[in-house]
Amino acid sequence: MLPQLSIERASVFALGLIATGSLVVAGPCDIYSAGGTPCVAAHSTTRALYSSYSGPLYQVKRGSDGATADIAPLSAGGVANAAAQDSFCDGTTCLITIIYDQSGRGNHLTQAPPGGFSGPESNGYDNLASAIGAPVTLNGQKAYGVFISPGTGYRNNAASGTATGDAPEGMYAVLDGTHYNDACCFDYGNAETSSRDTGNGHMEAIYFGDNTIWGTGSGSGPWIMADLENGLFSGSSPDNNSGDPSISYRFLTAVVKGKQNQWAIRGANAASGSLSTFYNGARPSVSGYNPMSKEGAIILGIGGDNSNGAQGTFYEGVMTSGYPSDATENSVQANIVAAKYATASLTSGPKLTVGSSISLQATTPGYTTRYIAHSGSTVNTQVVSSSSSTTLKQQASWTVRTGLANSDCFSFESRDTPGSFLRHYNFVLQLSANDGTKQFHEDATFCPQAGLNGQGNSIRSWNYPTRYFRHYNNVLYAASNGGVHTFDATSSFNNDVSWVISTGFA
């Protein structure tokens, strides 16, 4: 039991509403420290989590020359300097290479290595996240979160000070409650140091998604659960806790904490309101979880064995030494609400108009007579002009629709095959009939930005924001600026992904 003084100190930190700039004086980790459970890992690409922190939040690497830059808060305790990233990455692509630990323990997160499962990058590593996939504002100031696509993950297998064995710990994360899937496993927290499944109870991490292979909550999900290894748990039962609700706030606070034969799940709208407790009780009723056998590595976006099929968005999170009180966590939630997370535009460059017919012209020298078209389900570039046949003009024309998965972006419906849309499948663009599934909608949603070569637009995949419409050998792909596929070649990338959009031929 925390002394009343500690609880009051934690509350005063968060609720005193003494402000500098846009954020209250105390950060989440100041509040945890006041409550007697200090942060041993503190990760955020959006803001400082200590009032005095002015060091780097994250590192980006740009595609044009491989140079890196650290992005720090605008001021101590403040919001990230997104303008510094925008300037550094102007006219090229950028990836998030390091998410720095603000606790001083050096528990930085970097590209996850292979483990029980291999990632899609060379040598089995996971992908790195786009630096622009998750723009937000905090108190009106722009920042970027970490948009985790399937195959993307970060890890630290040599963390310092994190809980091991049955030692107590707490953790929270601010996530996008609308970005998830049912694959394993979008986690943040404590995992195995070997990147392999070493048995029941060897993890304690926040999970978010609608996976139903192990435990579930009420409704159809998504749920906040705990990945304790060899199971996603919503409570003491390995199967179901009806008290763990489906929850999908755009900004979501997720909390998991555990100590000897006790653990809890809590959650809230990160933009307003207070935390609710969805489970508080004994460890799971099956063997291997009492006592726990935590190993102390840190993961983001993946499972403990590097299962990397999940997706989600991470804005900030911490891990603590000791089991935080509800009062401390309530004060942290008040701080998160005071940060005023809000959405920001996913698009830039020349505007598109929903309902209009467009054609997309290549800008690569030597290919400027070619437009995005289709031959059946194959999407390619073809030479099109005002004197082309009506059939070809229709094949090279697309109706702009509101994004099927995100209304801030767009989907492109065929003019000559109504009901069929451009979508990527295995990163090859194809024309397919809308089957109404969540997966189709996500694969068929694209976000235009100012063209990387200074002309027109580059068309970015919403669910894989490192990937863009690219023509390669006159076939269309969702390509990244460097990668394992031949169509990811860096040569001519900026030209190949830039398109001049005009009124449709048909």
UniProtKB/Swiss-Prot annotation:
Subcellular location: Secreted
Residues at the catalytic site: E229 (nucleophile), D305 (proton donor)
One Pfam family in the UniProt entry: AbfB
Main location per the UniProt record: secreted
UniProt site (Cis-peptide bond): C184, C185
Region called Catalytic, residue ranges: 27-343
EC number, as in UniProt: 3.2.1.55
Residues with glycosylation annotation: N240
CDD domains in UniProt: beta-trefoil_ABD_ABFB (cd23399)
InterPro entries: A-L-arabinofuranosidase_B_cat, ABFB, AbfB_ABD, AbfB_ABD_sf, ConA-like_dom_sf
GO-annotated cellular components: extracellular region
GO BP annotations, alphabetical order: arabinan catabolic process; arabinose metabolic process; L-arabinose metabolic process; pectin catabolic process; xylan catabolic process
Keywords, ordered alphabetically: Carbohydrate metabolism, Disulfide bond, Glycoprotein, Glycosidase, Hydrolase, Polysaccharide degradation, Secreted, Signal, Xylan degradation
Secretion signal, residue range per the UniProt entry: 1-26
An example molecular function term from Gene Ontology annotations: alpha-L-arabinofuranosidase activity
Positions of the UniProt region annotated as ABD: 344-506
Catalytic activity: Hydrolysis of terminal non-reducing alpha-L-arabinofuranoside residues in alpha-L-arabinosides
Domain of life assignment: Eukaryota
Keyword Hydrolase annotated: yes
Pathway annotation from the record: Glycan metabolism; L-arabinan degradation
Amino-acid positions noted as binding substrate in the UniProt annotation, renumbered to this chain: D227, N230, G304, H424, N426, F427, D443, H471, L476, D496
Disulfide bond annotation, renumbered to this chain: C29-C39, C89-C94, C184-C185, C409-C447
Gene3D superfamilies tied to this protein: 2.60.120.200, 2.80.10.50
Comment text on domains: Organized into two domains: an N-terminal catalytic domain and a C-terminal arabinose-binding domain (ABD).
Protein purpose: Alpha-L-arabinofuranosidase involved in the degradation of arabinoxylan, a major component of plant hemicellulose. Able to hydrolyze 1,5-, 1,3- and 1,2-alpha-linkages not only in L-arabinofuranosyl oligosaccharides, but also in polysaccharides containing terminal non-reducing L-arabinofuranoses in side chains, like L-arabinan, arabinogalactan and arabinoxylan.
Protein name: Probable alpha-L-arabinofuranosidase B
Source organism of this protein record: Aspergillus fumigatus (strain ATCC MYA-4609 / CBS 101355 / FGSC A1100 / Af293)
